């Protein structure tokens, strides 16, 4: 179990969290020992700074809390935990939840409807998740609800709303937008050809630039082999922004055998 000297007087108990057990999930299996240590330190700080609020009778064990914190910190591992400033609570439902959604169509009419959501990220408010999809985010499958919502938070640091362009130098914005829209068009072409269910990238990525950035961030961290060869130029932009290269990391450190990568509950 990791123990941090700088947290010796911490009354929160985060220094005694089951960090090593929390690391035993496929999406984190390729991290080096140095990266694991850094992620653990960052996750401990995350739990100091944020409040995880379990809703509707859900109970979060210390292991659950540790893994949630690690997934939040993975995208900002090299950016710094300050990139997660701007919210103080993470609300967690047991399962996907129903919300009242309001939206305006192309001619200005406002519509209201009840929709099922997996997660939400409010610009100046909490992140909302559900436990069923958080558990699915432990796998290296291309799906990661936590990374998706963190990407939206990072996206909105660049302005009033999520645009698909995170906080990058102004000189890089045009190239980013070009490559992102090219990826959206490519994904839509595949959907038109084979259908949403058979598409190799989640069809949600084709809906708008903000969702494309969030969905591809999921693949960036949990299924880089599906992202990098298909969109090499955009892949390099993601590597530059996140200051990580999950595909190179995976090749350098190697993935453990399936028997060694089982999730410990």
From Swiss-Prot:
Domain of life, per lineage: Bacteria
Residues involved in Zn(2+) binding: 111, 148, 152, 211
EC number, UniProt record: 3.4.11.-
A family per Pfam: Peptidase_M90
Regulation: Association between Mlc and MtfA may induce structural changes that activate the peptidase activity of MtfA while inactivating the DNA-binding ability of Mlc. The aminopeptidase activity is partially inhibited by metal chelators such as EDTA and phenantroline, but not by inhibitors for serine-, aspartyl-, or cysteine-proteases.
Subcellular location: Cytoplasm
Cofactor: Zn(2+)
Keywords assigned: Aminopeptidase, Cytoplasm, Hydrolase, Metal-binding, Metalloprotease, Protease, Zinc
Cofactor binding annotation: Binds 1 zinc ion per subunit.
Keyword Cytoplasm: yes
GO cellular component: cytosol
GO biological-process terms attached to the record: proteolysis
SUPFAM superfamilies: Metalloproteases ('zincins'), catalytic domain
Keyword Zinc: yes
Primary localization class, coarse: cytoplasm
Record-level Gene Ontology MF annotations: aminopeptidase activity; metallopeptidase activity; zinc ion binding
PANTHER family in the record: MTFA PEPTIDASE, PROTEIN MTFA
Domain notes for this protein: Zinc induces structural changes at the active site. The holoenzyme adopts a self-inhibited conformation and is most likely not productive.
Similarity comment text for this entry: Belongs to the MtfA family.
Chain's role: Involved in the modulation of the activity of the glucose-phosphotransferase system (glucose-PTS). Interacts with the transcriptional repressor Mlc, preventing its interaction with DNA and leading to the modulation of expression of genes regulated by Mlc, including ptsG, which encodes the PTS system glucose-specific EIICB component.
Subunit structure: Monomer in solution. Interacts with Mlc.
Name of this chain's protein: Mlc titration factor A
The organism's taxonomic lineage, starting at the top: Bacteria, Pseudomonadati, Pseudomonadota, Gammaproteobacteria, Enterobacterales
